Amino acid sequence: LECDAFCHEKFFHIYLRNANSQLLVMRPDSDDAGFENVTDHEIKKDTGMNFDMHYYKTTKPSEGMPVAFSVKVDDKNYYMCCEEESGKMIVRFKEGQVPKDISGDSNIIFFKREFNSTKEFKFEYSLEQGMFLAFEPEGIYRKLILKKLSREDEVDETTKIRI
């Protein structure tokens, strides 16, 4: 199947953990997500903890596998996207499904790259080279953000995400 840019290929149910083994949890009331101390026994379905990672085929050569993320909370589906707010790129979650086909550029696509093992990755935002999903402390939890790295090969533990 050929398309202009990205065609949905498959998806996997996953849990996303940061370098501190904290679990990514999406909060629909604030349209964002953060990493929290959650054990495997505390994980519940449809509570913003169990993500789907959608793989896309692309006609353009890319630095890594194009992926998008979605999550279900209380029988509603949300997808991860990036938007500019007050001159800064932020990670948001919007109600809806990830599209099957995406023509052209998209604010939901990230390039999955190996970090340093087969289970640890970093995810580069497709619309801005050098911008990666990361986390930063905010109050009692670590908020999911986009972070600019000065060099592509820079090792930054805040961008490491374990699947």
Protein language model regions, located:
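Lectin-like carbohydrate-binding module/patch detector with strong preference for beta-trefoil
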Residues: 1-163
